[in-house]
Curated annotation (Swiss-Prot):
NCBIfam families: PRK00124.1. It comes from the Bacteria. It comes from Vibrio cholerae serotype O1 (strain ATCC 39315 / El Tor Inaba N16961). This is UPF0178 protein VC_0881. Coiled coil: none annotated.
C-alpha cells in the first residue's frame, strides 16, 4: 500500500499528520503538487512535482495509483477515479469516499458548479475544524492498521 496526496490544496495540518503516520508505519507517502512541498528527508516520504495545468497532478495520481493504495484528496472526480481503480480515497476533512457515496458527491459537486456558473455565490469551504482533523487522523489510523498491521 502506498499513500498518494493531492498536495496542491492539502492543508498543512493534514500534511503533518500524514508525515507522522508515514514515519510511524514506514508506508510510502508521495505528495504530488505543481509546486515544491517542504518535506522531511525520509526514504518513504517523497515529493513529486508536476507541471502546472488543469488536472495535471490529478492525472499523475490516477496513473500511478494501484488497487489498495490510499489517495488523500478533496477532489471528487479524482476520488471517483481512484475508487474505480480499487484504491481508497480519503478527504482531508475525514470523509472516506466509497463506491456507495461517491456518485452522490459527484452529483452535489455538479449541482454546485451549475449554481456558480449561473452567478450564484456558493462560498468556499469553512476552515478545517478540530473534529475534522481528528476524524481524518482516526480514519487514516484505521486504514493503516488494516493494511500494515
Amino acid at each position: 500500500m502506498k499513500i498518494w496526496v493531492d498536495a496542491d490544496a492539502c492543508p498543512k495540518v493534514i500534511r503533518e499528520t500524514l508525515i507522522r503516520a508515514a514515519e510511524r508505519t514506514g508506508v510510502e507517502c508521495t505528495f504530488v503538487a505543481n509546486h515544491l512541498i517542504p518535506l522531511p528527508k525520509r526514504d518513504n516520504i517523497r515529493a513529486l512535482q508536476v507541471s502546472s495545468g488543469f488536472d495535471i497532478a490529478d492525472n499523475e495520481i490516477v496513473r500511478r495509483t494501484e488497487a489498495g493504495d490510499l489517495v488523500i484528496t478533496a477532489d471528487i472526480p479524482l476520488a471517483d477515479e481512484v475508487i474505480s481503480k480499487g484504491g481508497l480515497a480519503l478527504n482531508p476533512r475525514g470523509e472516506l469516499y466509497t463506491k456507495e457515496t461517491i456518485k452522490a458527491r459527484l452529483n452535489i459537486r455538479d449541482f454546485m458548479d451549475t449554481m456558480r456558473a449561473s452567478g450564484i455565490q456558493t462560498g468556499g469551504p469553512a476552515a478545517l475544524s478540530q473534529t475534522e482533523r481528528r476524524e481524518f487522523a482516526n480514519h487514516l489510523d484505521r486504514i493503516l492498521a488494516k493494511r500494515t498491521g
